[in-house]
Amino acid sequence: MRRRKPVETVLEPYGAPLICMSGALRAIPGNNIQDMQRRLKILTWHTHGSYLYYLTQAPHDFYVLSKPHRPPGYGGRCGHIPWGDNLIDLPVSAAKDMRFDCILFQDDDQYLKDQFLYLNEAQRRLPRIYLEHDTPREHPTDMRHPIDDPNMLLVHVTPFNALMWDSGRTPTRVIEHGALVPDGVNYDGRLERGLVAINHLGRRGRRLGGDVFLRARAAVPLDLVGMEAEEMGGLGEIEHAQLPAFAAQYRFFFHPIRYTSLGLAVIEAMMIGMPIVALATTEMATVIDNGVSGYIDTSEKTLTARMRELLADHEHARQLGDAARRTARERFDIRRFAADWDAAFRFVTQC
C-alpha cells in the first residue's frame, strides 16, 4: 500500500504555526504575477509530468531531483514535454550543496525517506509543502493523511479530495488544476469515435475503470491512448504536445474512472472544445453540467446511450464542446493556477 500510518515530524518548526486555510486563492484581475517579489527556488520531484509542466508556469525556479538512468520519480528534466528554462535538473548527489527557499513534496517516500537521504539538516528545516495528488485509497472518508504537521502546508488539487481526506491538524488549501490553451487547436470531431486517455489502465484496475472501459468499447467505438495502452488494445502513448491536435478529431472524450482526482486529460480535452462523457463521481460531478457541456451519470447504460447520441449528431456534440471549453477556460485558467501557487509559496516562505 502506498499509504502508511500518519507521521508526525520531529523537526523543529521554521517559524510560527501556519494558519489553516481552505479554498483556492483567486488571481486579482489585471494583476501580473511576473511583477511580484523575487523569484523563489523550489526543490521538488518529477512525479506527474503534465502537472509539473503547468506548475512551472508559476514565476519561480524549480529544481527537480534526478538519478542515473532516470528511474520513476527521479526523471529530473526529461521527456518530450517542452520545459521552460525555470525547470532545472538536479542530481541527488548535488542537492545538499544547494540553497532553496521551499521544499515541495509530492509523494510519501519523498517526505519519509528522500529528505533524510539527500538533504542536509538546514534544508530539512525550510518551509515545506506537501502536494497531495490523490484521493484517499484505503478508506474514502476515514483515512488520516500521513502528513501530520502544523508547520507544513497540505495542498489538495480538488475540493472533493480535501473533503474526503482527514487532514488532521495540518493546514490545508485547495489549488485547482490549471491548463494551457493550445494555440491553433480546436475541436473538429469528424471521427465517429470516442477517445479515452489514461496511463497504465491495464494494471490500475477497477478504481480507474478498466472494466467500465472494456464494456463501453464493446458497445461503441472507443480508442485508448496513454502509457501501456497497447496492453488493452489501445494506440499507445501520444506525446503531450501532440495530444490536443490528435484528440480534436474525435467526437467525444470518455472518462471511465470511478475514483481518483480530476484528470488533467479531461481539462485539456475541454480546453479545445471536446464534449465529455463521464461517470458522475468525485470532482467530475461539479465540472460537467449534464446535458450542457457533456454527460455524466452513474449508469453505464445511460452513458452508452449518450455516446451513441453524440456519434449520431455531430452538431450537438459541437454545442456541448463549446460549453465545455467555456467552463474550462473560466475555471482552470493557467493564470489563476500560477497565481494560486505563487501565493502558496509566498505564504509558507513569508516572502
Regions found by a protein language model. Give the residues of each.
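Extended catalytic core of nucleotide-activated donor transferases of GT-like folds
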Residues: 44, 48-51, 60-151, 159-160
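Conserved catalytic-core segment of nucleotide-activated headgroup transferases in glycan assembly
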Residues: 164-167, 178-237
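Aromatic "clamp/platform" in nucleotide-sugar-dependent glycosyltransferases that forms part
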Residues: 258
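A charged, aromatic-enriched C-terminal amphipathic alpha-helix characteristic of glycosyltransferases
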Residues: 312-350
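A short hydrophobic beta-strand element within the catalytic core of glycosyltransferases
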Residues: 253-254
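Conserved acidic donor-binding segment of nucleotide-sugar-dependent glycosyltransferases
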Residues: 19, 290-301, 309-315
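Short alpha-helical segment that forms part of, or immediately flanks, the ligand-binding pocket
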Residues: 244, 267-271, 282-286, 292
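Short hydrophobic beta-strand element within catalytic cores of glycosyltransferases
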Residues: 275-278
